């Protein structure tokens, strides 16, 4: 299932969640990105490369370097995060390990220079200047509105969590040894210049982060220098290292990453448990007990043969399944993603408003990109029977300040009987629909459905 990124720090004291603080410029540059839709945002994000070209030739295949000589775009990138922003952030309470890592690459290894507890800007700047340490700031979208705006749209576009980290490295220094990641990475160069070397993956589309020794990675397949306004993409598993050239100002870049634990293998793991449960209800062969002392045996050839037969049976059943059960992936995504970008009073966003829907109303879905529909198990606490329900999860009330920080999160949404699925799909697949036309048996059920969705701010009367 998708996992929330956890800061890889050694700070012992985590401290309370930082207060929300604005570090925006009083009058920032206008955005060159298109925020009208998720697809429009991504198209402008990788411009001038076309989206179709990107997914056909680069996505999960090879790196893409976009070097732009565009002063307006460079100015916009610089506004996303600056070294100078750290001073105001430190004054609001950020902590080593949770929010900030301070590190250097020493003899091919990462050396963490974190202090304990709260970060003080003067100490941070001293380590940066005197120890030539790299400052890694975790999940800056918690504080920077424009990064929130970008990443929220990217989460809608990819249907996967999107995290970010800022790296600020002084001249003539390198923060991290050669390594590869378990995420798809987009790098935006914000300040200064950064010299990059990319290498052939030893584990294509890697599922885990790993450091690689210099003597194992061979010669670079790509070598270049990023300047403000440039963008770099590379697939998970791509070995890389980067340094700030001597004699120049510091470098600041942000990595925007996605698709952690979002492979077909992850999706299969998420689906298979529900499929086995449903099949076992209908097929006595799966409910039969395993042979005596099976767990004590060393040989497993006969067992493997029996299991392969069950898997073939499950495959046959899967092809005819109308609704795929999801154990965690959909819920986890809805619970942990960013809330909709909204600069007004957030209370208005999550409070139902407008006309109350009735049987004669026409309604339409709101926040379509922030809602997931799934079928999952439900156990009645009164009689301990287990069945299936339709779950509607949304991210309207999610907390921006804990996004991708590994915190326990609360799920928001609704639960309906399985018989409501067709009516829910009607609402999902229509630009607008009459409540009377919903595929439910009684008018009471129709009103119950739309009132429940309206209360959660998921539909409006048109």
UniProtKB/Swiss-Prot annotation:
Cofactor annotation remark: Binds 1 Fe(2+) ion per subunit.
Binding residue positions for Fe cation: 179, 181, 240
Entry annotated with the keyword Transcription regulation: yes
One Pfam family of this chain: JmjC_2
UniProt entry keywords in alphabetical sequence: Dioxygenase, Iron, Metal-binding, Nucleus, Oxidoreductase, Phosphoprotein, Ribosome biogenesis, Transcription, Transcription regulation
CC annotations in GO: nucleolus
Compartments where located: Nucleus; Nucleus, Nucleolus
Cystine connections: none
Region (Disordered): 1-24
Enzyme Commission code: 1.14.11.79
Cited Gene3D superfamilies: 3.90.930.40, Cupin, JmjC domain-containing ribosomal oxygenase (ROX), dimer domain
Cofactors named for this entry: Fe(2+)
Listed GO biological process terms: ribosome biogenesis
GO MF entries: histone H3K36 demethylase activity; histone H3K4 demethylase activity; metal ion binding; peptidyl-histidine dioxygenase activity
Catalytic activity, as annotated: L-histidyl-[ribosomal protein uL15] + 2-oxoglutarate + O2 = (3S)-3-hydroxy-L-histidyl-[ribosomal protein uL15] + succinate + CO2; L-histidyl-[protein] + 2-oxoglutarate + O2 = (3S)-3-hydroxy-L-histidyl-[protein] + succinate + CO2
Domain spans labelled JmjC: 139-271
Record-linked PANTHER family: MINA53 MYC INDUCED NUCLEAR ANTIGEN (PTHR13096), RIBOSOMAL OXYGENASE 2 (PTHR13096:SF7)
Annotated family: Belongs to the ROX family. MINA53 subfamily.
Protein purpose: Oxygenase that can act as both a histone lysine demethylase and a ribosomal histidine hydroxylase. Is involved in the demethylation of trimethylated 'Lys-9' on histone H3 (H3K9me3), leading to an increase in ribosomal RNA expression. Also catalyzes the hydroxylation of 60S ribosomal protein L27a on 'His-39'. May play an important role in cell growth and survival. May be involved in ribosome biogenesis, most likely during the assembly process of pre-ribosomal particles.
Protein name per UniProt: Ribosomal oxygenase 2
Source organism (scientific name): Bos taurus (Bovine)
Highest classification ranks of the organism: Eukaryota, Metazoa, Chordata, Craniata, Vertebrata
UniProt gene name: RIOX2
């Amino acid at each position: 299932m998708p996992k929330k990124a956890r800061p890889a720090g050694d700070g012992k004291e985590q401290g309370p969640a930082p207060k929300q603080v604005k570090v925006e410029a009083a009058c920032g540059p206008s955005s060159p990105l298109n925020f009208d839709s998720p697809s429009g945002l991504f198209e402008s994000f990788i411009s001038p490369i076309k989206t179709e070209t990107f997914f056909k030739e680069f996505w999960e295949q090879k790196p893409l370097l976009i070097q732009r000589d565009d002063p307006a775009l460079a100015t916009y990138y610089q506004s996303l995060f600056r070294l100078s922003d750290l001073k105001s952030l430190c004054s609001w309470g950020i902590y080593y390990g949770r929010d900030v890592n301070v590190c250097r690459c020493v003899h091919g290894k990462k050396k963490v220079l974190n202090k304990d507890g709260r970060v003080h800007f003067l100490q941070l700047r001293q380590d940066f200047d005197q120890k030539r340490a790299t400052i890694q700031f975790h999940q800056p979208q918690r504080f920077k509105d424009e990064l929130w705006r970008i990443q929220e749209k990217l989460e809608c576009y990819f249907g996967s969590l999107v995290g970010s980290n800022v790296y600020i490295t002084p001249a003539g220094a390198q923060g991290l040894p050669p390594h590869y990641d378990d995420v798809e990475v987009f790098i935006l160069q914000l300040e200064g210049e950064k010299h990059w070397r990319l290498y052939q993956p030893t584990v294509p589309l890697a599922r885990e982060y790993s450091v690689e020794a210099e003597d194992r990675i061979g010669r670079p397949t790509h070598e270049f220098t990023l300047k403000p306004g440039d963008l770099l993409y590379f697939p998970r598993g791509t070995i890389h290292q980067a340094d700030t050239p001597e004699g120049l100002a510091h470098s600041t870049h942000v990595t925007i990453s996605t698709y952690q634990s979002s492979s077909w293998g992850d999706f299969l793991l998420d689906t298979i448990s529900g499929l086995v449960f449903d099949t076992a209800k209908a097929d006595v062969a799966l409910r039969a007990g395993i042979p005596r002392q099976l767990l004590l045996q060393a040989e497993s050839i006969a067992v493997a043969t029996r299991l392969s037969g069950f898997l073939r049976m499950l495959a046959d059943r899967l092809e005819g399944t109308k609704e795929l059960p999801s154990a965690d992936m959909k819920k986890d995504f809805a619970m942990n993603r960013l809330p909709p970008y909204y600069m007004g009073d957030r209370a208005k966003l999550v409070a139902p408003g407008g006309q109350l829907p009735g049987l004669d109303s026409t309604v339409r879905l709101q926040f379509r990109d922030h809602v997931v529909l799934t079928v999952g198990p439900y156990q009645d606490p009164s009689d301990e029977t287990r069945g299936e329900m339709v779950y509607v999860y949304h991210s309207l009330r999610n907390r921006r300040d804990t996004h991708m920080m590994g915190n326990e999160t609360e799920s928001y949404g609704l639960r309906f009987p399985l018989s409501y699925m067709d009516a829910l799909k009607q609402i999902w697949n229509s630009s607008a629909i009459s409540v009377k036309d919903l595929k439910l048996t009684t008018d009471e059920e129709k009103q119950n459905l739309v009132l429940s969705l309206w209360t959660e701010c998921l539909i409006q009367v048109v």
